[in-house]
Design a protein with these regions (language model features):
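Transmembrane alpha-helical segments of multi-pass membrane proteins
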Residues: 82, 154-162, 278
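Hydrophobic aliphatic residues
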Residues: 26, 30, 39, 44, ...
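Small-residue (Gly/Pro/Ala) motifs that create kinks and tight helix-helix packing interfaces
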Residues: 23, 164-169, 313, 343
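Short alpha-helical functional segments enriched in proximate histidine and acidic residues
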Residues: 12, 74, 115, 119, ...
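Hydrophobic alpha-helical transmembrane segments of membrane transport/permease proteins
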Residues: 16-75, 172, 176-216
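Alpha-helical transmembrane segments of integral membrane proteins
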Residues: 2-3, 113, 121, 125-145, ...
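An internal, D/E-rich "acidic patch" concept
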Residues: 59-131
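N-terminal signal-anchor/first transmembrane alpha helix
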Residues: 1-62, 105, 110, 127-128, ...
C-alpha cells in the first residue's frame, strides 16, 4: 500500500509539468505581437512600442526559454534599484488581472472558498442519494422505482446545465423568491464586515454553524440551493445509472448466490456482500465527476451570479483577460490532480488487488 501511494505521489510533479506545458503551449499559439497586448492596457499602435514590449519580455525567445521564465520568473531591478522577482507561477505569481484589478492569486484566495463551499454541499447529495437510488433500483429491477430511476438518469444526463439553471431561476426566484441568487443577503455582508462574525474557514455555511448563527446558515443555504441542484443533477443521474449497472452485475455473482443459499437475510446479502463490491466502478467515476463539477461551476456560478472561481473565469473570458484565464486554469488543473490522487488512494483502500499489485 505504501509503495502504491509513493508511486502516485511521484506521478503528481509529472502531471503538473504536463498541465503547465499544455496551458503555456496554447498561449504560444498567439504570435509575439498578439501576446504583447497582454502586457499593456491598450494595444500599442506604434511598431517601436510593440518591439520594445517583445524585447523586454522575451516574447520571441525559444519556447522552452519562455516556458522556464514563466515558471520561475525573472529578476529585475525595481524603481529603487533593488533586485526583485518578476513573475513565476512556482512562486505563486500568476500575473495581474485587468478584469478584477488585482493579482490573480488574490482572486483565487477570495473566490475559491466560495466555490469550495458550494462543491462540498453539492458532492454530499450527489454521492449519497445517487448511490442509494442506484442500489434500490437494482434491487427492485423492472419495478416502478427502477423504471423511474432509469427515466431520471436518461433525462438528467441529457438536459443542458444552463437551461436547467435558468428554469430553476425562473421557478424558484423570479416567480416565488423562495431561493436567491448571489452569495448572501446584504445584512449578512454587513454582519461579516462588522467583525462580530468570525471567519474560521472562510466557508460561509460552515462558519455560520461554528458561530452558532442559524439565521446566517439559512441565508447561505437559500443562496446555494439553486446552484447545488443545478451542479448535482447531471452527476446524480450518472451515479444512479453506474451504481445500478454495477449492482445488477454484482447480484449475479456466485458469492452473492451462495450467500443467499446459506439463508442470510436479504438486507445482509445486499449491504455486506453485494453493495461493497459494486462500489468499485462508482469510486472510479468520482474523479470524472469532480472534473464535471469544476467545469459546471463556470456556467452555474454565472447563471446565479455566485462569486466563485467559475464566475471569475467567465468574467475574464468575456474580457479576453488571458492572464487571469491561464492562472485559473493552472489552479483548476492542480485541484483536479489532487482530487484524482485522493480517489486513487481511496480505490486502493477498497480494492486490495490494486494495493497488492
Amino acid at each position: 500500500m505504501t509503495n502504491y501511494i509513493i508511486r502516485r505521489l511521484l506521478l503528481v510533479p509529472v502531471l503538473l509539468v504536463g498541465v503547465t506545458l499544455i496551458i503555456f503551449g496554447m498561449l504560444q499559439l498567439l504570435g509575439p505581437v498578439e501576446r504583447s497586448a497582454l502586457y499593456v492596457v491598450d494595444f500599442p499602435k506604434n511598431e517601436k512600442q510593440i518591439d520594445a514590449v517583445i524585447k523586454r519580455y522575451g516574447l520571441d525567445d525559444p519556447f522552452f526559454v519562455q516556458y522556464w521564465r514563466w515558471l520561475v520568473g525573472v529578476q529585475r531591478p525595481d524603481t529603487q534599484g533593488n533586485i526583485v522577482r518578476d513573475g513565476g507561477i512556482l512562486y505563486g505569481d500568476f500575473g495581474y488581472s485587468r478584469t478584477a484589478s488585482q493579482e490573480v492569486i488574490d482572486i483565487i484566495k477570495n473566490r475559491f472558498p466560495n466555490t469550495l463551499d458550494l462543491a462540498l454541499w453539492t458532492i454530499f447529495p450527489m454521492l449519497s442519494v445517487g448511490i442509494w437510488m442506484g442500489v434500490k433500483a437494482a434491487v427492485n429491477q423492472n419495478k416502478f422505482f427502477d423504471q423511474a430511476a432509469r427515466i431520471y438518469s436518461i433525462i438528467g444526463t441529457s438536459f443542458p446545465t444552463f437551461v436547467f439553471g435558468l428554469l430553476l431561476l425562473m421557478l424558484l426566484y423570479a416567480n416565488n423568491q423562495w431561493f436567491l441568487p448571489g452569495k448572501m443577503s446584504d445584512w449578512v455582508s454587513i454582519l461579516i464586515y462588522s467583525g462580530e462574525f468570525k471567519q474560521y474557514t472562510h466557508l460561509l455555511s460552515i462558519d455560520a454553524l461554528l458561530n452558532l448563527r442559524l439565521d446566517v446558515f439559512w441565508d447561505a443555504l437559500r443562496h446555494m440551493i439553486m446552484p447545488i441542484i443545478t451542479l448535482s443533477y447531471i452527476s446524480w443521474a450518472t451515479f444512479v445509472r453506474v451504481t445500478r449497472s454495477s449492482m445488477l452485475e454484482t447480484l449475479r455473482m456466485d458469492y452473492v448466490v451462495t450467500a443467499r443459499a446459506k439463508g442470510l437475510k436479504e438486507s445482509d446479502v445486499i449491504n455486506k456482500h453485494a453493495r461493497p463490491n459494486a462500489m468499485l466502478p462508482v469510486v472510479t467515476m468520482m474523479g470524472g465527476s469532480i472534473v464535471g463539477l469544476l467545469g459546471g461551476v463556470v456556467i452555474t456560478e454565472t447563471v446565479f451570479n455566485y462569486p466563485g472561481i467559475g464566475k471569475a473565469a467567465a468574467d475574464a473570458a468575456a474580457q479576453l483577460d488571458v492572464v487571469t484565464i491561464l492562472g485559473l486554469a493552472i489552479f483548476t488543473g492542480l485541484i483536479l490532480i489532487i482530487s484524482n490522487l485522493v480517489v486513487d488512494i481511496l480505490y486502493a483502500f477498497i480494492d486490495p488487488r490494486v494495493r497488492l499489485s
